[in-house]
Amino acid sequence: TYEPENRLVQELAVLREIQMPVYSVSGNHDEQYPGPPIQKLLAKALSENNVMDIEGKIIEFDEFRLVGIGDLWAGKANMRFLPELPQDKPWLILSHNPDTVDMVPELPSHPLMLSGHTHGGQIELPWVTSYIMKRVSILGHKKGFYSHENADVFVTVGTGMVGVPFRFRVPPTIDIIELI
């Protein structure tokens, strides 16, 4: 989301081509942690490209419920309300920062959280990247599937970059997860 403000709609236009609903939650750069003040511009760009911001919302599916959780660094990662909601089917949680997984309360079903934030480390150097990740992230999750006490989390590398526009040994990914 550091794209030039006048290009956000154009940069996100590829999402309009997806023939399924597309959901999003804001991340730290979208919330100015750090980053320019683009919340209104980003909301407009997402809307124009048929992307539904589900922060603080619940989407009902036949087999599960999807809930959007706000960004941890922006102080919007509240999940205390989850136990008060119907628990008749599993929960899928969409939250930008994987460190949010330890905030998931105990629920009858063991939710799966989908996250990003880490860029997979963006530049992978043996030992160095893991060392740095453990200092800039509470849990140090770079990519993939991790089990936790009250929920599991899948962390995608994603397609974005932060700082230097460069990746090394961490190619961008768009992950497809089949829920069975």
Label every PLM stretch briefly.
Residues 30-112, 118, 136-180:
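Conserved catalytic scaffold of divalent metal-dependent phosphoesterases
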Residues 4-8, 94, 135:
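A conditional alpha-helix N-cap/helix-loop micro-motif detector
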Residues 120-125:
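His/Asp/Glu-enriched short active-site or ligand-binding loop at hydrolase and phosphoryl-transfer sites
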Residues 127-139:
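Short, surface-exposed loop/helix-turn segments at secondary-structure junctions
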Residues 1-52:
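Membrane-embedded segments
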